A protein has these predicted regions:
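Sequence context surrounding c-type heme c attachment/ligation sites in exported
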Residues: 24-60, 65-152
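Sec/Tat signal peptide C-region and signal peptidase I cleavage site
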Residues: 17-24
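Acidic, low-complexity intrinsically disordered regions
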Residues: 4, 17, 93-96
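Bacterial N-terminal signal peptides that target proteins for export
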Residues: 1-9
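Bacterial N-terminal signal peptides
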Residues: 8-16
Length: 152
């Protein structure tokens, strides 16, 4: 094998290991919610790159990302947090269950704001309007993580 091919093979292997280690042996409902959060994060990053000008702006892709985020939010997200599901490597704070109405409110707000982002992108709304909707949605993620995610 050529040295350059070997380096690419090693790099690809390390990259794949990083993804596997990211969930550090999570199983069951903890893995399901970590996978859902990873999917949300991937879509948020995709839209963020477009709105920052680091990737070509594509309203169809933004609408698709909004739909994907909405699909993981609201009741779907809430069901991923049954009481006593703090098995390692969960990053969920026990305060979720003490402040359930606030937590579920964030989940519902994420769904609503992601649906709004999707709708605006589908309608061909001005990029600044889409960016404002994205900012609101991302702000919901940030607020929820600050309140209910254990800091690494």
């Amino acid at each position: 094998m050529k040295p350059s091919h070997l380096l690419w093979t090693i790099a690809a292997g390390i990259s794949g290991l990083g993804a596997a280690w990211a969930h550090g042996g999570a199983t069951g409902i903890v893995k399901e919610r970590m996978d859902a959060m990873t999917e949300i994060s991937r879509n948020v990053k995709l839209v963020g790159q477009m709105l920052k000008g680091n990737a070509a702006y594509d309203g169809v892709e933004i609408a698709r990302a909004g739909q994907a985020i909405a699909a993981h939010a609201g009741d779907t997200m809430i069901k991923l947090f049954p009481e006593d599901s703090l098995n390692a490597p969960s990053e969920a704070s026990p305060s979720i269950w003490n402040e359930w109405s606030q937590f579920s409110g964030y989940a519902d707000s994420l769904r609503t704001s992601a649906q709004s982002l999707k709708g605006l992108a589908e309608q061909g709304a001005d990029q600044k309007v889409v960016a404002a909707a994205f900012g609101k949605m991302a702000g919901t993620c940030k607020a929820c993580h600050e309140a209910f995610r254990i800091k690494k």
